[in-house]
C-alpha cells in the first residue's frame, strides 16, 4: 500500500509537465502545508483531498487527504523518466503515471492503498481582489510633473550579480503612467486573452507564437524610436574620435521597412540592439586610443595630493550635577556642578569641579579606570559611573545630565573611546546605519547630509555624536531612477565629504528601481565575507509590476547580517496583499548560508534588518488623522496603523522589533514642502484618498542573547524632492570574532558536549505522523538529526504533542570546546515529519544559558514560513572542559541598566546583563559582565545548605529585566558607592525574563489582602523564567516571543484585538461571591473530575475579556469561514493538557527540578511548567475513593511515625506512596524538614491532585 514514510527522492518533472493544461482545481501551487491542512479542515468530509508542491523535494508533489479529521500526506515523486509515482512502503509495487490527472483518477477508486479514496477535490480560496486590479491603484508610483527628470542617457552597469540592466529613460506619457513598468498593461491583456489562442496553436502543431510576437512588437514599438535616437547620437560622437568611420547606422535606418510584420519588427530591434552594443564598445576603445596619444605629448600630471586622514573626534564637554542623597546635600549645602570632558583620541575622561571661590578641581581618569556605566531607568538623564580609585577598589558617582539625549551621547563617546583604545584585535561592537527612502522617481537633491547624519524628527542623535562615522551604512531606496553606478558614487561621495573616509562598497543589488547598497569602513573590508545578493518580484504572478524586494547578506567576522529592502503593494485596502508580499519575500529571497535552506531568512542571520516602503496605511478618517498630526499626538494613530495591527495578529513580521515611532507620518507630502500632506488625488476612476501614513519603516530581528540597541529612529524634515520623507535608524550591534582557540583544536579528552535530556514540542497539525528533529549550527561540523519521537498525544484535533527522550536525541560535539567561543553560538532546530520530510516548525536556541554542569530548561516558539506553528521546550546542557573556561569582558557589556535606584547609596547597584530604556520600546541595553572569572565558578561550586534540600539556585539577571535588588538580611552592608560583585552564576539567560517574588508583569496589581499566604521561604531564591515578546513600541500591547534579545518585557501572549483571550484553566476563574457556591476555585484533576480546594497563594484576578464570541471551539474545522486565522497557535494549544495535568493556578510559578523555575506564559498549555523527567503518576482513582482511603493522624505524634520511620513509610501510612519518588528527587528526603514544604513544592514534586495536596499539608500541620 501507499506509505507516508521514506527518504527524500530525487527531483524530477516540474509541475507543468506533470499536470497538463489547464491546471485542475485540486492542484494548489505554492500552498504551504499548514494552509493545506486548514483548507481540508474547512471541507470537513472524509475523502477531501488536494495536491500541492512538496516543501522538501523540488519538482515533487504532496497529496493531502482528510480522513476522520486527520490529514494524511503522501509524497508523489518523479523518476528519471519524468513518470510520477506515490511513494510506497517497501515491497509494494510502484505504479507510474505520466500526469497527476491520471494518478488522481486511479486513486479516486476505492481500495487502492490510500487511507481512503479521493472523493472531494478542495479548491483554493479566491482572492478578494479582482484579477484586473493592478498594483498602482493610488497613483503612488506615478512620476511627478516637477522637477523634470534628467535627460542623461548614460546606462550604468549594476554592481551586484544578477541585477537587471537599467532601462533607458523614456518621456513620460499617459500610456507610460498607466503602465509604470512598460509591459504590465499589454502583458496583462495577453495573459487574459491571447494566451489561450497561442496554446491552441501549439497544440495544433504550430512552432511559433503569433499572438505573443504581436504583443512583444507592440510593447517594444516605442523602444524602436528611442534606439534610433541613441544610435544617431552615438554615430556623431564616434566621428569625433574617428573621422573615417562609415555611416553604418544611417544606412541601417534607411533600410527599415515601415510595413514590417511583428516578427520582422522584433528581428530588426534585435539587430539595432546588437549594433548599439558594438557601437558602445567601439567608441570606448577609440576614445581611449585618442586620449592615450594626446597624453603622450602632454606635460606630466601634478603629483596627487596626500590622502586625508579621517576626521578626529574633538574633545566634548558635558555639564552635569552630582546626584547626592538628602543627607549629603545638607552637609554640602548645595548640589555640586561638574563638567565632564571626554577626550576620545587621548583616551581620558576629566572631571572638572567648580568651587565657590572660582577655583577649579579636576580629576583625570584614563579609559581603563572607568569600570562601568549604569543607566538609570527611572530617571532618564541620570548615569552612574564606576571608577577605579585604587587596586580592587571602586567608587560610583551618579551624575544628572541636562537631558536624556546628552546622557546617551556621553555613553556613546565613552564606548567609542573604549573601542579605540581596546587591546583587542577585533571589535566587539559596531555601529550600523540603516536608511530607507522612496525617492519618487526624481533625482535626489545635492545635499542629503541630514539623512546620513540622522538629523530631523523623531528619535535623533545628539549633535555631539552625529559626526562620528558608522562602521556600516546600508541605503535602501524605492522608485530610484538614478543608475546603479551613479547612485553608488553619489553615496560614497557624500560619506567622503562627511567623514573623510573612503567607504568601500560591499554589495549593490537592484530590481527595477528598488535598490540596496552596503558600504563599510575601509578597516572592515577584510572582515566581510560570504557576500550574497538576491531579489524577489511580487507584482502580477510574482513576475510583472514594480514591486518586490532586494536583499544583501554577509558575514562580519563570526556574525551574520541580512538586509532586506522592499516595496510592497500600495493602496489603503490592500493589507492582505501586502501580507502575502511579505510572506513571498520571506520564502523566496535566497540569502545566507545555503546549508540553512530549511529555515526562512528570519532565522538564518544573527541580525536581520527589514526596511523599505512597506505601504501599510492608517485606518482612520482623513480629517481625524490630520487633526492628530497637527497636535503631534501619534499614539491614537499608531493604534490604527495597519502594520501594527497585522503584527499583533501574528500575520507578518513574527517577533520582529521596531523602535518607538515619535515622528510624523512620512507619506504623502506635497513635493517641495514638508508642511502639507497631499492626500487628495483626482484619477480617471474618481477621487483617490491617500491618507498620511507611516509607509516607510525599519524593523529588525536578532538571535536570542545577542546585543543590539537602536540609538535613533526618525525621518528628515529638509529633503522635499519626493512625496516620502527619508527615514533612518542607527544601531549598536555586538559582533563576534573568527575565534581561534589558544588551546588548539579539541581533543577527545577535552571535548565539549551538547547533551539533551528531553524535548517536547506542540505542533499545529491535523496529521498524526511521526517526527524527528534536525540540529544545525556553525559550531557543528555537519547537521545532526534525532530518531523519531517515542511518545505523542493529542487532546485537540489540530495540535499534536510529540516528545523525545534522551535515547532518541543525539549528543552534539562542537568543533571547539572553548567557553568564549560557545557562549556566542546558537543552535537551530527544525521539527520534520517522517511522512514527507517537511518542516512543521523551526526555532533558535542560544547556547550561552545552557552552559554548565547541570541541565537547563529552554522554551521557545516554532514558526514556519512566517507563521507561528507551535512551541518547543526541553532540557539540555553544554559541558565545557575545565581548562577551557577562560573568557573576557565584551565592550557592550560595559553599560548596564539600573531599574531601581531606591536606596542605591545603601546597597550595590543592580549589575544586570542589561535592560531597556523605557523610551525605547525595543532597545536592548548592554549587559554588564560579571567580574567573577568563569573558571572560578566551575572550580568552586556552591556548598549545599545543611537542610538536606538541593541548594537554591543563585539569582539570575536578565538583559530585559534585571532583578530588583533585595536588602540583605545578614552580613555587613556594602560600602557606600562601591559596586557589589555580581552573583555567582555567569550563565543566566538574558533572553528570558527573570522575576523574583514579583507578580506577573502583564497582570494588574492586586490590592493587599490580609488573607493572602506569604511567599514560602522555600521558594525565596528560586528563579522564575517566562518567555518574552518583542513589543511593537509603547503604544502596542506586548506579545509572547521567542527567547530573543530583541524582546521587550512581556510575560505572556495577549490575543489580537478581534479574538477573545483563550479560556484560562478552571482554577483561574474567579466567580463573584454571589455566584461561587463553595469557597475556593474549581480545580480540574487528571481524571477530568473536579474538586474544591483553598485558593492558592499569589493568585491574580482574571483580566476582563474583550467583547467577542466565547472561545469554546477547539477544532479549527469548526471555525466559521470568516475566521482570519490570526489567533496565536499557543493560545489554541493551551487546552492540550488541561485534562492530563492539573494547572498550578493562575499567576503561579511551577518549579522545575533543577536550578530554574519556569513560569508558563499565558496562552501556553497549563502543564508547561511540569517537570520533564519526573511527571506525576496518573491518578486513576476518583476523588471519593481517595478520600475514603485517607485516615487522619493521631494528635500528639508525628504523622505516620514522622521522624521515626522513613519518607516511604509515612506516605504508605496515608496511602500516597506514589509520590515518594518525586518528593525524594526534589530534595524532600529528610522528614525533619518536611514541615516546611509548601503547596508549590508539592506541585513541583508531582502532587497535582488538590485533595492529595490538602491531605499532605493537613497531616503535616497536625504533626507540628
From Swiss-Prot:
It comes from the Eukaryota. It is an enzyme of class 3 (hydrolase). PROSITE patterns: SAM_DOMAIN (PS50105), SH2 (PS50001). Keywords: Actin-binding, Cell membrane, Cell projection, Cytoplasm, Cytoskeleton, Hydrolase, Immunity, Lipid metabolism, Membrane, Nucleus, Phosphoprotein, SH2 domain, SH3-binding. It catalyses: a 1,2-diacyl-sn-glycero-3-phospho-(1D-myo-inositol-3,4,5-trisphosphate) + H2O = a 1,2-diacyl-sn-glycero-3-phospho-(1D-myo-inositol-3,4-bisphosphate) + phosphate; 1,2-dioctanoyl-sn-glycero-3-phospho-(1D-myo-inositol-3,4,5-trisphosphate) + H2O = 1,2-dioctanoyl-sn-glycero-3-phospho-(1D-myo-inositol-3,4-bisphosphate) + phosphate; 1,2-dihexadecanoyl-sn-glycero-3-phospho-(1D-myo-inositol-3,4,5-trisphosphate) + H2O = 1,2-dihexadecanoyl-sn-glycero-3-phospho-(1D-myo-inositol-3,4-bisphosphate) + phosphate. Residues 124-137, 957-971 have a biased composition (Basic and acidic residues). Belongs to the inositol 1,4,5-trisphosphate 5-phosphatase family. Phosphatidylinositol (PtdIns) phosphatase that specifically hydrolyzes the 5-phosphate of phosphatidylinositol-3,4,5-trisphosphate (PtdIns(3,4,5)P3) to produce PtdIns(3,4)P2, thereby negatively regulating the PI3K (phosphoinositide 3-kinase) pathways. Required for correct mitotic spindle orientation and therefore progression of mitosis. Plays a central role in regulation of PI3K-dependent insulin signaling, although the precise molecular mechanisms and signaling pathways remain unclear. This is Phosphatidylinositol 3,4,5-trisphosphate 5-phosphatase 2.
